[in-house]
Amino acid sequence: MQEKDITQKMLERHNDVFSDIVNVLLFDGKKVVEEETLFDAVTDSALKIDGRVRFQDRDVAKYWKDSQINIALFGLENQTTPNKLMPFRVISYDGTEYGKQSRTENIDKKKYPVISLVLYLGFEQKWLYPKNLLGIIDVDEKLKPYVNDYKINLFEIAYLDREIIDSFKSDFWILADYLHQMRVNRNYVADNKSIGHIEELLMLMSAMTGDKRFEEIIDEANTKEVVNMCEVLDIVEARGIEKGIEKGIEKGREEGADIISRLNTILAKEGDLDKIIKANTDKKYRNELLKKYNLLRDYEK
């Protein structure tokens, strides 16, 4: 889980990917947020709870600026499995940023909204938990009019309409396409769309699929200047074949050593040292003995 979380962050921290996600999910694909207007925000913060200092860390956060003025803070939170308490987490993240704006040193500065996007990257099941605060807490009906509700902006990437998925222009399209195909077909067929951030994407694919070959081929992919997932999968497949051959050779060595050991044991019991020496130096004679004692039978199937 932690590995997936880290690799998702690596890809989304790139401004072209981050702005693409925001523009497609919030603005119907219109290029409202430009790459150059995004600036990294601090993602970790400390809270004092029950007398102890506890730390919380957003996945990715960026300020959207006009000149030096903050228009908004966007935060991305990735989830590969549904989390019933996600509204609590989002409130905590957002509240920390609003709390920062309320400090004395910021009193005269322009105030800006905090917008968190929860990206659900699972494809085995839909997100069935409530997406608002009142959906997860028990509230007496007499109190309900006074309890502020808080909803989360949750996007189930694998379940987006195909038209929306195809609106992504960055490497995030490759991830969204993969999730969609796995949900619908339980199989992935690569596309020839160009990859912008090869290392980050391959590490993410390695974490999402559990196939370490994606990560193992990063250097080779960079050397060969791989440009799309079709080429990536060609290398991955070749690496698999190569490993299969290596395993076959190793297995053959082990089986060969086992046969020779069994032959030497038989000859030793016969007490014929000359046979042992000749069997280990004369290949033709050794093969005759192997056939004579039926030692090849188990390995010829």
Describe the function of each predicted region.
Residues 1-301:
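Elongated, amphipathic alpha-helical interaction scaffolds
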